[in-house]
A protein has these predicted regions:
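N-terminal leader/signal peptides at the extreme start of proteins
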Residues: 1-16
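Periplasmic/extracellular, small/polar-rich flexible segments of pilin-like filament-forming proteins
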Residues: 2, 67-138
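Short coil/loop residues immediately preceding or within conserved phosphate-binding loops
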Residues: 13, 25, 101
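Internal alpha-helical transmembrane segments of multi-pass membrane proteins, especially GPCRs
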Residues: 14, 19-23, 44
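Alpha-helical hydrophobic helix detector
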Residues: 21-38
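Conserved alpha-helical elements of the SDR catalytic core
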Residues: 35, 42, 62
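Membrane-proximal amphipathic alpha-helices
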Residues: 40, 44-55
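N-terminal alpha-helical signal peptides/signal-anchor transmembrane segments
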Residues: 54-69
Length: 138
């Protein structure tokens, strides 16, 4: 059986056309444009959850300090940034306390500043505040 060079490329030739590849690229681009902002909101929310957990833990530590010393003055936060494991700082934490009250405030930093909740705080009576909607932020 003699093969002709003209038939070599046509018999069993497969692959995608340029138009098909461009359609796939466009579909991926559209899906990315829709999904990425939603993903970013979940990332901000998870970082906010981490700092809220830190703030509640530090408030409990401040209460233990108060039960021993009968004052909040002199208590210091074990970590002044979140995440406490290191890495990029997402929140700066500040403790302000006197004899009978305290407030722990978390101020967003860097990319976290885009979070709708903004600054979060908790006090000795477990009153929580936020720059955004309280029910959404706490």
């Amino acid at each position: 059986m003699k093969m002709n060079r003209r038939n070599l490329g046509k018999a069993g030739a497969g692959g995608f056309t340029l138009i098909e590849l461009m359609i796939v690229v466009i579909v991926i681009g559209v899906l990315s444009a829709i999904a990425y902002p939603s993903y970013q909101q979940y990332v901000l929310k998870s970082r906010r959850g981490a700092v809220k957990a830190d703030m509640v833990e530090y408030a409990q530590r401040a209460e233990r300090f108060h039960s021993v010393n009968n004052t909040y003055a002199g208590y210091a936060l074990p970590f002044e940034v979140s995440p406490r494991e290191g890495g990029t700082v997402r929140y700066n934490l500040v403790f302000v306390g006197d004899g009978s009250s305290f407030t722990i405030t978390a101020t967003p930093d860097g990319q976290q500043a885009k979070d709708v909740c903004g600054e979060l705080s908790v006090d000795q009576a477990n009153r929580k505040t936020a720059d955004g909607e309280l029910s959404e932020c706490w």
